Structure formats: structure tokens, C-alpha cells
């Protein structure tokens, strides 16, 4: 899990994925040839060129976060969200800002000073600020610039029984899975991309797929798990500990039926736990990849993850390992039977 720890703790808000990209290039330099395209996608080709079919693997490097929009006279920072973040979870959270990783705390008007009406309503992002301990605007401007990114400051840890917690598991968990697959050898062509700007509109994946021109694509995600108090069992999207989740449909994507059926067949044949992703909420790079060129048969396989798009997410190590096993088995099935 050392690589996943590095990936989780790296700063990589949409549009600023450099740190994540560098970690992956260093980790995988022995296994693949890399190219960074104009948008920032990290494209790869396995060093041992195989036969058809040409299989694309994709996982996005970016995470939701914040961007500094103004520096006030008293040294506090105003900000906007980058990607989908619930304003209600921001107060009192610690962040790191910009290339120098300046520490900050997200603050709000003290509850003791809030009137009854203010206390009844959830705080909006426009009412929040970041405190970096600056004396005034001049002091703050020495440390931070408008346009700097801020990401949550969260330590990756293993806790409980085979459970991990950390920030940005959507989708550093997918990057980790793809990295582990890249370390294996296959007789088919393996290409793919660690993509950028997924959280703000699936921007990188289409550019990547256009360049790679695969026969089929496998997108690896960290999807939300709703197996928590307050949600009825029949409304669970995915459940921790029940294996990778296979998407039928989300707001951007409808799975290739043949690929979806094949994934479940491969899982059953190899005794790998696997679950359907039950709701059609959210969107993934799969929606963009499948519509490139003449169309690319695509499947999205995800690791169930609680509390995504927040300062800390939770996932099951067994689900991560079973996702690696499932994708490995699926590639071997393509190697044996073709498309």
C-alpha cells in the first residue's frame, strides 16, 4: 500500500496533477513507455508490445479541491470549489495551498456570533475563508497567489481490519490498480492513460482515447459506497467488502453489454467477488471514451469507497486487491478469446 499512500497524499486538484503524474512515472518507468500530452494526460504503452486486441486502461489523476480567488486585507483567503464538494463538510478542515504547500485552516464566523437564523442554515462556501496565519494581505501575498490550488491535508492510514482511509481515493485508488496491472506481462497490447480534469467535466479522457485508438477500454474508478446509517439496504449503491463494482449506467455512460456480461462471467469463473453498481448517479471517463472516433466498447470497474469528494474517504483493501485480480483475469480472457 506504499504506492497508494503516496498517491493519496499527493496534491492533484483538477488542472494541477503534476505531483501525481511524477509519482506514477517514477514507479512505472521500467514497465511502460510514457508521454505527457498537451492537456496533461500521462499516456502509456507497455514495453512488451503484444498482439490484438488493443486494450486501454484509464484512471483519472485529479481530485476535487479548492482554488484561491482573493486575498483579503486582513490576510484571510477566499476560495471557490474545483469539482463537486459539499459546502457543509469544509469548516475547520486543514488544507495545503500552492506549490510550497502552505498550511491553512478553513474557517467561518464563530458560532457564538451567529444569530439563530444563521445557525439553522448550513454554511455556504461564500461565507468561508482560509486562515494561513498571515498578519495582513502583504504577508499572505508572500506565501500564496490568487489562482493557487488548495487540497485537503489528510494522512493516509490503515485502520480497522483491512480498511484504508485517505483523501482523493477517487481516483488515486484507480491509479493504483492500473499501476499494479502495468507491472504484469500480457500477450495483448496494453495501452492507456492516467487522465486529467475528470472532476470538472471528463476533459482528459476523450483526448487520450483519440490518441490511443484502442479496441476496448477499461476505466477504473473509486465509486461511492452508501452502506451507511440513514440509507436503506435496497438503496445501497455499492457495499464495502463485496468486491469491485461494475457499472451498467451512470449520468454520462451506458456500459457495453457484451463487456459487462463478460466481466461477470470472468469473475464467476475465477471466484472473484463482484457486485453491480446499482444507481445511475455520477459520471465517469467511460462516458467520454466510449464516444470517441467510431465508438469504443467500454466498461467501468470501480472500488467501492465511502465519503468520496470529502477530506477523507474509506475503502476495503480486499476490494482493491480483488479489482486487480478481476482486471487481470479479464485481460487474460481477451488474450485467450479475443474481442
Task: Mark where each language-model region is.
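N-terminal hydrophobic/helix-forming segments and targeting peptides
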Residues: 1-339
